[in-house]
Amino acid sequence: MVQDETVEQNWYEDDNEGEVGYSFKEYDVTSTPNDFNTKTIIDFIESGLFKIPGFQRNYVWDIKRASKLIESLIIGLPIPQVFLYEEGKNNYLVVDGQQRLLTIYFFSKKRFPKKDKRFELRQIFEENGKFPDEYLYNDDYFDDFKLKLNDTTILEKNKLHGINYATLGEFKNSFDLRTIRNIMIKQNFPSDDDSAMFEIFNRLNSPKLSSFYTLHFNFFRICF
């Protein structure tokens, strides 16, 4: 157990030590934009249409950062687009945007993963394609997800602070129907590998990767 926790802590590092190397290669890639609302995204995650590939890191956001994303969606501010790689028909791997997608999913379930359980939860998700209810509603693994937001001014409290998905009230439709841009990527050439997925991930994320995670990503790319 101590070993797992040590590994998990390394996944949270956030330094700028080096970039992942790559070889020069030309690609033929089709990129298709799609705007999905949050309810559709939640359905896609639950049905296994959106998958988290093995080279992705754990869920690392804290409750404050997660709450700011949900607040942005509710009040109508744009958030960064999500990149998805088409591995097969109705089968998409999340290249960039895992933290945002899982935050939306967790909020809809009114549950937030405990930091010391995220390494184990990652394995559970990979094995099941989702978070089974026996874990999702187990207080040993998850806390209640209530928005944790700062007051808007000294004299005015943030009206969204402390609420969860069930208590959104007048804001529920705003959250449920808010659309997020998703870029669906399909590699046409080369046709014998998925290397475009790794290159896109590398170029979007390499400045944010820890030295531990860079080694993990390189190993996964070589093996697969």
Language model region names:
Residues 4-7, 12, 24-32, 55-60, ...:
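Basic- and aromatic-enriched surface patches that contact anionic nucleotides/nucleic acids
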Residues 16-49:
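N- or domain-start disorder-to-order transition segments that initiate the globular core
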Residues 47-52, 63-65:
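Short Pro/Gly-enriched beta-strand edge/turn motifs at strand-loop
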